[in-house]
Amino acid sequence: MNRIDYIRNEEKKYHDLCYEQYKLFETGSWLYKPVKTVMDLMDYFEGQTNLQVLDLGSGVGRNSIPIAQKIQNTSGTVTCVDLLDSALTKLQTYSKEHDVFEVIKTEQAAIENYYIQPDTYNYIVAISSLEHVQSEEDLKNVLHSMKKGTKTGGINCLIINSNIQEIDLHTNEELDALIEINLPTEHMIYLLKSIYKEWQEIKIEIKELAYNIVRNEREIQLKTNAITFIVQK
């Protein structure tokens, strides 16, 4: 098994377990509520109809279901892309529970293999998902596709992890971070800014985050510089 397959297998185990253990919008995990920044940006589209939203790495719908609720009476659509069928199956169930099944479209694919229709979306969201493409080259290609896929006046909202460290909490040993792309923060920001150079910057922010996860019965602290990068075409 090559490195990418191994990482994706581990990620699948972690997420499958999380989606089984925790219910969407219940306290106890990161599924508890949508990302505030993602929802706040919906104000930009106030009064617009037929909004087309793309959620890359949607998971079980933490952000896409609340977005769908906001646009459900204005003939909009949220297209949700995820690698994990377990996530999309749960997303479909949750979308029925929250009465937005008609508004949500699911597509199973690795983000780097997903074809983004040009000039189609008003709002593209990618939360902690772009660092899971296979290579830096793939990341650049996806970002260019996102740009092409955005309508004039549309917004891209990315939260992308950089400079990720994993530390075994029992031994204090630094482990090889199980992430496909782990770029230094400055490098990642430079890459994003250079690709989106002709777009209007709405917000760029770096937050140091640390949280504990369990992987293969090991308690691990995950440290990351999470970059929020929001731009308008």
Question: Which residues fall in each region the model found?
Answer:
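A structural alpha-helix within SAM-dependent methyltransferase catalytic domains
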Residues: 65-68, 143-147
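Short catalytic micro-motifs in class I SAM-dependent methyltransferases
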Residues: 128-132
